[in-house]
Amino acid sequence: MIERGKFRSLTLVNWNGFFARTFDLDELVTTLSGGNGAGKSTTMAAFVTALIPDLTLLHFRNTTEAGATSGSRDKGLHGKLRAGVCYSTLDVLNSRHQRVVVGVRLQQVAGRDRKVDIKPFVIQGLPTAVQPTELLTQTVGERQARVLSLQELKDRVEEMEGVQFKQFNSITDYHSLMFDLGVIPKRLRSSSDRSKFYRLIEASLYGGISSAITRSLRDYLLPENSGVRKAFQDMEAALRENRMTLEAIRVTQSDRDLFKHLISEATSYVAADYMRHANERRIHLDGALALRNDLLGSRKQLAAEQYRHVEMARELAEQSGAESDLETDYQAASDHLNLVQTAMRQQEKIERYEGDLEELTYRLEEQNEVVAEASEQQAENEARAEAAELEVDELKSQLADYQQALDVQQTRAIQYQQALQALDRARTLCQLPELTAENAEHWLDTFQAREQEATEALLMLEQKLSVADAAHGQFEQAYQLVGKIAGQVSRSEAWQCARELLRDWPSQQHLAERVQPLRMRLSELEQRLRSQQDAERLLQEFCKRHGQQYQPDELDALQQELEERLESLSQGVSDAGERRMEMRQELEQIQQRIRELTTRAPIWLAAQDALSQLGEQSGEALESSQQVTEYMQQLLERERETTVERDEVAAGKRAVEAQIERLSQPGGAEDQRLVTLAERFGGVLLSEIYDDVTIDDAPYFSALYGPSRHAIVVPDLSLVREMLEGLEDCPEDLYLIEGDPQSFDDSVFAVEEQDRAVLVKTAERQWRYSRYPAVPLFGRAARENRLEILHAEREKLAERYATLSFDVQKTQRSHQAFSRFIGNHLAVAFDADPEAEIRGLNTRRGEIERALNNHEAQNQQQRQQYDQAKEGISALNRLTPLVSLLNDETLQDRVEEIREELEEAQDAARHIQQHGVSLTKLEPLLSVLQSDPQQHEQLQQDYTQAQSVQRQAKQQAFALIEVVQRRAHFSYTDSAGMQNANNDLNDKLRQRLEHAEAERTRAREQLRQYQTQFTQYSQVLASLKSSYDAKRDMLKELSQELVDIGVQADANAEARARTRRDELHAGLSTNRARRNQLEKQLTFCEAEMDSLQKKLRKLERDYYQLREQVVTAKAGWCAVMRLVKDNGVERRLHRRELAYMDGDELRSMSDKALGALRLAVSDNEHLRDVLRLSEDPKRPERKIQFYIAVYQHLRERIRQDIIRTDDPVEAIEQMEIELGRLTEELTAREQKLAISSKSVANIIRKTIQREQNRIRMLNQGLQAVSFGQVKSVRLNVNVREAHATLLDVLSEQQEQHQDLFNSNRLTFSEALAKLYQRLNPQIDMGQRTPQTIGEELLDYRNYLELEVEVFRGSDGWLRAESGALSTGEAIGTGMSILVMVVQSWEEESRRLRGKDISPCRLLFLDEAARLDAKSIATLFELCDRLEMQLIIAAPENISPEKGTTYKLVRKVFQNHEHVHVVGLRGFANEPPVLGVTAAETP
């Protein structure tokens, strides 16, 4: 028997009146006796504070404050303490005989709020000899002690060996340890639990029927069916989780395509870009190598072109030089031809002009004579006309002057003055100072005679001059001819010079006749010389091209050698062409094969990927199609075996679940029909009565009752007899036992207990021997133990079933994968590696291309040699006929000799041609040159002088005529006399004027006639002179030009000059053609060089740029490769089949995937940001980071509880397998988890029945309790009507409300709340949610109503109320209720604490004096029967014969207040022992 724990003592340190006091507590009743203010309540307050150190609950008031809403300000604690550190400790000895000291350290906090600081602590393992006061205080003198602080206490305790000190910051931890050690009856998990415990202690302390407890009896007495409630909550949570899991699975299944899509598109997006960069890197590397090869080749080609350019430039310079010489020669020949043609034309013009000059000379002589005569006549007529004109003018002037002076004197004076002026002018001209108006007429006759004489003398001299001019003209002509031929010669040497010229004339004519033969001979020799020079030039060019000097005699042998070489080179070129054609054909075949393999490679790579995946899945090395088919057969066999094993495991799992379901029935009823029959018979299942049996006693009772362990206990078998008739729905064996279900025991059998077996004597002649079952199932503890085992077994079977299901589906998927592989890839999977063949073919192609390039270079060299040999033979064909000409060494001398003779002949011919006519004319005039007619100049001077005299005579005669005409004017001395004179003069003047005008008219007419005739003669003469002068000048110019031309104009000169020019033109054309060809070749070469240089610069720029790109890309590629390899995604990204797609296709693939990814990750901010960053084309590593982020995101989304891999791709494959299995399993689980409404009603009813039975058992313990007129106390338990209706509907009419319980949108609790509202529409549910109401309806306590009833006097059973009872009766009734609550708590908490722990029972009662002696005795009896401790307080001793009594007296000594305590132990059955303690020294 387990002993109940007991409180041994209470210690107060530094409380008001108690410095260090320990109260030993009695095992039953401890009484505190004393007057008012003695310290009884303080002692009890210290006990309660140590028991419940919660300042939010503690409120110590006296009985006068009962029912008050507020007490003292400090709630009764602050005033009970003294300044400094205070302690309140309880010394407990629990069922394990462990000494435990629990207590609190209290200290007042300064301030108006009068707060108290509390620190709970526990001391374990304290030796029995150590008293609490010794532990908490330190002696400092004989009668003085000091209270230790908490830290000092801790240090002191830790110094003790084996003693533990624990300080708590949480009241929950403090109470949890107290519950585990058996100090308090219930685990106080929360503040509400502490509040209940405190309210119980408070009700016990102040006594009476506590309304706070009676109103909440359900919470105090009825244990919370946390198991059932938790089962419902777990069921709902499991259903909710199951539905959420199913929904998540459905969402996951719907998201599976999204995951696949995300993986596929991310792989396409990143792998396409990854392979595009890999391809571009390979292309860039190949491009860089190709550019480098092109660069080197271009440099070599540029060097060759530069060498060729230098050679062609040198040859062009030579050709240009030769062309310049040829152009000079050609231009000279052309100029010579032009000069010859010009000379011929000049010669013709000279001859024509010489004839014209002879004719013009004759005509000019005749016309000179005619003009001379006409000139004389013209002079005479002019003089006559001039004189007539002067006379008319003078007369008119005189007449005008006279007319003007007719009326004025001035006019006469003017005329007179004019007459004087005319007289002076005449005197001046005639040099006659004595001339007067009277003798003017005389002198006029004289001077007119002089004029006549002068005119006659002039005519005579003119005739003489013309005769002298004829002789003088012949001499001059001859002199001019000599000067023209021989140059400047004196007139005296002219005859001698002319004779010498005429003497040399015949020899020069002979030389001139040899010009044409010499010219023809020279032309032939020059032509031959030019041919020799051309041949020498051709030979030099030939030697220069061949780099060797050859003699003309060696040309024949050289030609034969070149012809043989040309034949061999021609054969080599032909063979090279055939070889080149063969290599090109082979190259085309290789390229065609590479294209075919390139087309096949992606298909083969896809097949290899599929094959590698199959190899990874199977773990086999699949090397042939036969192995694939054999392994596929193995998969079929494995699938069959795994399916069989899975079905076996499923059957075992169903069997275990059936056992679990049977054992999970409430009350232990394995057959649900027994529950129905028990309700029908009004009995209780035997298993339900023994439901609380321990697991240790379960085998005994199971063997004791044997097959009847499933019997129904009924109050009266006779009442059941009639119900058994016609009973069909029942087990095969139905056991019925008569007995009271409330007080049933095992006395119905005679039993002998043996070693792990029992012998049951069911009758005198019938025994039953039953062994203890190996797996007992009798009692809730045994069933729960078995359920734990079955649950563990079910979990193992479920795990095994899940593994087998997964293996089956994995095998099926592997079989499907093999089937797809056989259908799609088997035909090509085991073919040879096309990439290896491509690499070999690429190597061979490179070799062929290099050989072809070398062959092209050799062929080009051979062709050049062939062309050189061909050109050499062509040059030799031109040089061979000229060998004799090249050997002629005297040709140049002969040409020079003939050229000198030709020059002499040409000089003679030019002299004859230039002066032949002059010599012909000079020959007859040679004799004229012997005498020089110098007197011709004297005659010319006389003629000029005669002309001057004749003109002067004419002027003098005219001046005298004017004076004679103005003689009348000299007489104007008198104006009167002058008037008459004027009239006469006017008439005369008019007559004279008329006569003069007539004379003038005749003179003018005659002058006009002679002028016209003279003009005509003069014009003819001028024309002849002009023509003569022009032709003479032209002849001089022509002769000078002919001399300047310096070419002998003959009949053959033009033909020779033209022939020479044509030859030079042909040579120049040939040279120009060659030069143009060289220029074109040079231009083409320069263009080729420029192109090569541009190409070279571009190649260098492109090469260095590409090389820089390659170097730059290498760093980025290294970063990409590090990311790829570090994260293990290279196998996913390096898809070799993508290497056969071009950049545009890969970019298009990546762009399409990017568009799909933007939609796929639009709801994921992280992936959306990473995707946006990955779009930077300059940062390819960000795409890898995005791919890694996608993988990481998917890894995080992998359900590790159902997926066994970290690879999202494999996870998706496993997900497809596992989700299907989980869907089936969870659907089945939901059907199993879904509890029926009838089962819920049965569970609640069974729980209500069990609690009713438990309350009846508690009532049995209170039947003998009596206080005053109260003879008995009991608890009445009733089911609420509305809740009873709900249970009836749940058990019998659930089909009518399946719309609530079959709804997936409602939990069971919500459906239950909806049904309660439907059944009770009149009840207001307030603001509570259906879930809250449903959870309350799942708590059986809400179905019950508890009332305390007392049997009092003649009134019978009455409801226990304070107003209907006396104070003592109320105190006793309240104490009974509290004892019942404590018992209920202990039973409720029995399974929560150790099996060897029985908790302490202690209650309080203040003001116990209100109870009579009988009631006090009842309390003592109750404490004895229930092993309960009780602390009571009263002003006077109460029943000192039992328990322990302390007498408390408060005293004041030297201003120090203390309590004097005297202890007395009960003396009912033993001698009284009186213990008195001395007063404390504060």
Swiss-Prot record:
State where ATP binds.
34-41
What the record says about family reads:
Belongs to the SMC family. MukB subfamily.
Cellular component GO terms, alphabetically? cytoplasm; nucleoid
Q: Please give the organism.
A: Serratia proteamaculans (strain 568)
Query: Would I find Membrane among this entry's keywords?
Result: no
**Protein's UniProt keywords contain Transcription:** no
UniProt name for this protein? Chromosome partition protein MukB
Query: Quaternary state and partners of this protein?
Result: Homodimerization via its hinge domain. Binds to DNA via its C-terminal region. Interacts, and probably forms a ternary complex, with MukE and MukF via its C-terminal region. The complex formation is stimulated by calcium or magnesium. Interacts with tubulin-related protein FtsZ.
Location relative to the cell? Cytoplasm, Nucleoid
